[in-house]
């Protein structure tokens, strides 16, 4: 039996609407169940990304850390040219800070990193030998 699957990711946001605009710019579909303070986006492979006001979490867990938060969010793509397409798509998007241009690594990757409007780091990449289905299922090899 497979272990539990990651299928719901919540991001605490100081500006929920700005972050929602960012996800829409990536082409993600917003759920009709969204509310102004609680936005839901359907990603690929069944994952749901929820955006909540940061104050709700700070009351429960304490203040958010500034700077790198110890994790990155990954968008794995089906082909190396998709990396360049997404890079072009993100140029000029409010709050998307492109940290580097797409590059080829000696480890078989093509990718780049960006910071979203809330300061989260995203890695956008293609990896030689891996497959991504149209539904977004990733097979890592």
Model region roles, listed by residue range:
Residues 56-62, 131-133:
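A short, acidic/glycine-rich surface segment
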Residues 20, 59, 84, 122:
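Alpha-helical elements of the RecA-like P-loop NTPase motor core of helicases
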Residues 1-21, 73-75, 127-141:
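N-terminal beta-strand motif that seeds the catalytic metal site of vicinal oxygen chelate
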Residues 26-27, 81, 94:
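Structural motif
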Residues 10-57:
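Core segments of cupin and vicinal oxygen chelate
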Residues 21-25, 86-91:
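Short amphipathic alpha-helices in soluble, non-transmembrane regions
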Residues 2, 5-14, 41-42, 62-141:
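Vicinal oxygen chelate
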